[in-house]
A protein has these predicted regions:
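Alpha-helical transmembrane segments and adjacent TM-loop junctions that form the membrane-embedded core
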Residues: 1-91
Length: 91
C-alpha cells in the first residue's frame, strides 16, 4: 500500500494563484492535490457572494476549471466546492 502524496508546494501555490485571479472568488481553502498517473487531481473549496445565482456560481467554476486545465492539461481532474462568503475574514 502506498499513500498518495500532494503535488509540490510550487504547483499548489500556482493553483491558488490561478483561482485568486477570479475577482468574485474569495478564500480558496481545503486544497487537496494528487497525481493520477500522468495527470493532476485538484479539489478545493471556494467562497462566493451568497446572493449570486446558481448559474453564476456554475459559470465561475467553469472559468476556473478552464484556466486550471489550460495550465495543467485537459485531463486534469477538478472538484470545486462552492460556499457562501459568511464572515469578513472570507473577503
Amino acid at each position: 500500500f502506498r499513500s498518495e502524496k500532494s503535488l509540490p508546494t510550487e504547483v499548489e501555490d500556482k493553483i491558488l494563484s490561478i483561482i485568486n485571479e477570479t475577482p468574485e472568488v474569495r478564500n480558496p481553502h481545503n486544497l487537496c492535490t494528487r497525481r493520477i498517473g500522468n495527470d493532476f487531481a485538484i479539489e478545493v473549496h471556494i467562497r462566493v457572494d451568497g446572493q449570486i445565482t446558481v448559474s453564476r456560481a456554475h459559470e465561475l467554476t467553469k472559468e476556473i476549471e478552464s484556466k486550471l486545465r489550460l495550465k495543467f492539461g485537459p485531463a486534469t481532474h477538478i472538484v470545486l466546492h462552492v460556499e457562501p462568503i459568511k464572515e469578513k475574514k472570507d473577503e
